[in-house]
């Protein structure tokens, strides 16, 4: 969802009551209008997904996983994950645990890679050209974060505790659990990297479905 219109106080306040009180409070807690808009946009996307699944958004309750990932109570086959960056909020929904991440691509120093990644991932980054480094870095970063979110552990899981295997087919080498994970990337949004990770196996190509607030 492109959330720029939600930065308007009038639009923001007009849509705010459409989401649960907990999301209203979270959205209003941000200092900057862009962050408030992103948070509200994420809540509106979740509302829409719940309605499409035949679930009344007004009657849902959430609980937190061990890694503080929100999980929907009473609906074991409805798994979701939210992410936002720049002016976009995204939502992924699946029938098994899912993690999604979107990042707006900006300049970042190569030296940063040495501090956060597994040695195999560092080798991948070091092999990138100057032109390819920024998109390659954000591909890797979003793939890693999508996996961390799919496990439910989030950033309680160290970035160097597992290795994303970058190749013709994306994979992960990990000892976090004994589950299998599938990955895919969405490259339909220029200037952004988007990755999806789902527990249970391979994922096909996922098209980006844009929702714009007018």
What are these regions (language model features)?
Residues 1-214:
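Core catalytic alpha/beta fold that binds nucleotide/phospho-ligands
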């Amino acid at each position: 969802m492109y959330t720029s219109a939600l930065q308007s106080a009038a639009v923001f306040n007009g849509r705010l009551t459409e989401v649960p009180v907990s999301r209203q409070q979270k959205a209003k807690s941000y200092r900057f209008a862009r962050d408030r808009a992103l948070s509200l946009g994420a809540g509106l996307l979740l509302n829409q997904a719940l309605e499409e699944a035949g679930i009344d958004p007004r009657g849902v309750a959430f609980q937190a996983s061990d890694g503080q990932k929100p999980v929907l109570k009473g609906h074991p086959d409805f798994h979701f994950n939210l992410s936002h960056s720049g002016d976009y909020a995204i939502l992924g929904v699946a029938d098994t645990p899912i993690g999604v991440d979107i990042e707006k691509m900006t300049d970042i120093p190569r030296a940063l890679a040495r501090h956060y990644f597994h040695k195999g991932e560092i080798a991948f980054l070091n092999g990138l050209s100057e032109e390819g480094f920024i998109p390659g870095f954000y591909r890797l970063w979003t793939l890693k974060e999508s996996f961390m979110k799919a496990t439910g552990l989030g950033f309680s899981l160290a970035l160097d505790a597992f290795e994303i295997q970058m190749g013709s087919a994306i994979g992960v080498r990990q000892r976090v659990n004994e589950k299998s994970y599938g990955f895919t990337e969405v490259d339909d949004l220029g200037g952004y990297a988007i990755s999806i990770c789902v527990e249970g196996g391979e994922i096909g190509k996922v098209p980006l479905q844009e929702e714009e607030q007018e």
